[in-house]
From Swiss-Prot:
Gene giving rise to this polypeptide: yqgQ
Lineage: Bacteria, Bacillati, Bacillota, Bacilli, Bacillales
Top-rank lineage group of the source organism: Bacteria
Pfam families in alphabetical order: YqgQ-like (PF06014)
Protein name: Uncharacterized protein YqgQ
């Protein structure tokens, strides 16, 4: 699992399709959903850790991009 798309596809296998129109909120929600899946033993620790790392990186890039465009 290396990309944001990979994480989306993982969540999709559990019936989670996330779209709020706010990328930052979507990523934070996806992190919460991943945590719930892990805590309920639906995904392995390695899967959770890698997916969470991908999402944290994406969140950081999203926040930095948002700051960049604010001027």
């Amino acid at each position: 699992m290396n990309t944001f798309y990979d994480v989306q596809q993982l969540l999709k296998t559990f019936g989670h399709i996330v779209y709020f129109g706010d990328r930052e909120l979507e990523i934070e929600f996806m992190l919460d959903e991943l945590k719930e899946l892990y805590m309920n033993h639906m995904i392995e620790k390695e899967q959770w850790a890698r997916a969470a790392a991908v999402l944290r990186k994406e969140l950081e890039q999203t926040k930095n991009g948002r700051d960049f465009y604010k001027g």
